[in-house]
């Protein structure tokens, strides 16, 4: 029983850590890319990309529901 509980906790911690690390990496990469694109003076590209991502995510969520 103790072993099972310990194993479950370890799995949860590993999953949480992995998920958090992946999210952080994605944000950092995206932010860096955004900074590079925004620096040249092209906010239109970033805005379009963000809008497209948001629309796609919204569509997926609607479809799921």
Swiss-Prot record:
Residues 5-34 are annotated as: 3 X 6 AA repeats of R-R-R-R-S-S. Probably phosphorylated in infected cells. It is found in: Virion. Its main location: virion. GO terms for molecular function: DNA binding. GO terms for cellular component: viral nucleocapsid. Sequence repeats lie at residues 5-10, 19-24, 29-34. Keywords: DNA-binding, Late protein, Phosphoprotein, Repeat, Viral nucleoprotein, Virion. The keyword Cell inner membrane does not apply. Residues 1-65 are annotated as: Disordered. Residues 18-51 have a biased composition (Basic residues). Thought to be responsible for DNA condensation during packaging of the nucleocapsids. This is DNA-binding protein. It comes from Bombyx mori nuclear polyhedrosis virus. The lineage of its organism: Viruses, Viruses incertae sedis, Naldaviricetes, Lefavirales, Baculoviridae.
